[in-house]
Amino acid sequence: MHYYVDVVEREPQAGSAAWSRRYAELQPRLVRALAATAGTYVGVEDAVHDAFAAALSADREQIDNLGGWLYTVALRTLRRAQRRDAIARALRLPRAPVSGELERAVMRIDLLADLAALSGRERELLVARHYFGLTQDELARSFHMPRGTVSATLSRAAAKLRARERTR
């Protein structure tokens, strides 16, 4: 939580109480959404904090849906970190140890198992849609893809989840 204090202290004085409330409201949802998207909590909190830091320097009046904007920025940050980690693994660079206890507990949750069965794109769009209420048009703009692709991807993801539910 130390990073939370740093983020709040850099917020301009006039809006700090409002910004603190938004952080408290959105941060847990963003962490859950990114973990659901990625299928892991590794790197998620860092990506969320980086997204909030980016929001501090962004023109927030130009952001229609702060939760969706933060999710998109955090997802891109997480993807970059995952690519760097993949390169480090390929080069066999040492990596800091991660506690596996939380990871094992999270992986036992049916929802994460179901989401893991989806493609990355399906997972990202479905989580953004249901955690942050982004419309298909907003998803298309945020993810730089045609609206029809968004619609088809969401339908395919929902069908896969329904099929998994029927097999339980």
Each PLM stretch: what is its role?
Residues 27, 31, 52, 119, ...:
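C-terminal flanking helix
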Residues 2-32, 42, 61, 123:
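A short, charge-rich alpha-helical start-of-domain segment used by transcription regulators
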Residues 61, 65, 72-93, 103-104, ...:
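Arg/Lys-rich amphipathic alpha helix in sigma70-family domain 2
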Residues 75, 79, 137, 143-168:
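DNA-recognition helix of helix-turn-helix
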Residues 125-129:
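A short pre-motif secondary-structure segment
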Residues 5, 80, 88-115, 135:
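Internal acidic/polar
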Residues 46-53, 57, 64-76:
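Structural recognition of an alpha-helix C-terminal capping motif at a helix-to-coil junction
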